[in-house]
Amino acid sequence: MPTSTETPILRGGEWLIQPSEADSVFTPERLTEEHRLIGRTAQDFVVKEVQPKIDQLETKDWALSRELLKSAAGLGLLGVDVPEAYGGLGLDKVTSLVVSEKLAGAASFGATFGAHANLTIVPLMLFGSEAQKQKYLPKLLSGELIGAYGLSETGSGSDALGARTKATRQADGSFLLNGEKMWITNGGFADLFVIFCKVDGDQFTALLVERGWGVKSGKEEHKMGLHGSSTTALIFQDVKVPAENVLSEVGKGHKVAFNVLNFARFKLGAMCGGGAIGAIAESAKYAANRKQFGQPIASFGAIKHKLGEMVVRTYAIESLLYRTAGLVDARIAATPHDANDGSAALAAFEEYAVEASIAKVAGSEALNYVLDENVQIHGGNGYVHDYPAERHVRDARVNRIFEGTNEINRLLIPGMLIRRALKGDLPLIPAAKALQEELLGPPAMPSTGADDGVLADELRAIAAFKNTSLMVFGLAMQTFGTKLTDEQEVLMHLADITMDVFSAESAVLRAQAADAAKSPKASLHADAARVFVNDAALRIDASARQALAATVDGDTLRTMLAALRRLLKVTPINTVAARRRLADATVERGGYPFA
């Protein structure tokens, strides 16, 4: 299913050094009727089949989990990313995003679904041999077999390559697997596992391991949230794995793990966006009906601020997610490939690994804000089990740990950009040098490339954000050189600036597209984009100042701070009025105004 507009192909991270046009990005408003149809299918499945059974799932009824996965299979939801030749739907990544958004309402079952569809089916599709695909995919797609993914260990969470689980080659070519994996979703009842281990001492490798070969599950973990999903240790004691069950190649497990994480981070970001949209609806309805001092609390400015800000942050996340999906689909479409081969999708997600990490971090943190304010709007009712607000908070907390902690992903974002620059895939270094020369020349604002038009001030601000990012990147690379990887605090500030650049530009381009399409909601789109840009300017200024002060001192620091003041001359807007308009539209609709 192609996306409904042609998307020019930017390289990963290229938006950081050049402007983009509104017609170059995919937005939710450009969904086709096919996209919307499968979205409604997923939504109906969640509302009618999963949500009525959430309490039963939280009793650890794994038979029900299996039953629901089979129901999802019957609707084709397990095979969105799988070619038709293997029994899947063979749809685009925009569709995959839409389905992930809708599954956010499935509570714990969303984790069950994700471990099966995203972390078992996807790696098999991308890296499996033809024999492996023929053997396992049909049963995974039907729900006959349930999958799980075993990467983490007690001593190697973020340091995945430090795994101690080992596989010893036998004379017949098979492997004896020994070790233990921790925190495995679906660990209590899955039938097939993607397990990462060391072969011959140091060759990091992925194996497809069947439970029937001797895999044992530990006790169920008592978790903060996601009570309706199974999380256990997996124990391997001389489990014999046939040679043909190596996934990819011996010693290539890192490629499997890291590329699957690119997929998973993007989809986790999508679920976070969908979760935020659902929580906004809960807050809007509660605020409209809850009366204090003789009037609905939705009429109070303090509540309007919360609702408005919930919408602003969700709008930015949704915008960057759909933009990324459009880029991935365009890259796949432009790459000659066999439709039954996952190589094009693999290359596309590798290209946009930075954007996937941004989706994961920004999405999980925006959701955290929205869910926390949802509890606050509910007051005491938000803290009790009778309302879903408290469960949402518990269930969502792990999103900042899943698929690489947010700290790890923050380090990856600038790290990957720098590696791309050093390889010549991203002209970051020449752009930073050119900006430095411009800043050190006679006083004048660096060129922004933005002209007049709708949201022109915001585009000029975003150009300034990009220049700020280049200035800090360039100075940090110049000062620390190869030791920049040791300066994690500076890298974290760079990540925050980078995330705000991508989020802000995605929001503004979407709002411009809405205006160009003469959307009746164009003014609301503009409000959301303007508020986000206004506040991003404050965040970027703070991050840049701290990064600069950690990088240089004395006269050099004073010079760079003066340059920063020249760059970030952003006039504040009336965010109070804009948030009020967004809040009023949210209450009137009874939910997210852009849904």
Task: List the predicted regions and their residue ranges.
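N-terminal glycine-rich flavin-associated loop
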Residues: 111-131, 157-160, 168-171
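Short beta-alpha junctions and helix-cap segments that line functional grooves
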Residues: 136, 162-163, 180-182, 218-222
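Flexible, small-/acidic-enriched active-site or ligand-binding loops
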Residues: 214-242
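A short core secondary-structure module
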Residues: 174-219
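Long, acidic (Asp/Glu-rich), low-complexity accessory segments flanking structured domains
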Residues: 238-256
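Glycine-rich phosphate/pyrophosphate-binding beta-alpha loops
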Residues: 156-157, 182-188, 398-403
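A short, Trp-centered hydrophobic/proline-enriched beta-strand micro-motif
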Residues: 143-151
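Alpha-helical interface subdomain recognition
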Residues: 1-105, 110, 127-132, 143, ...
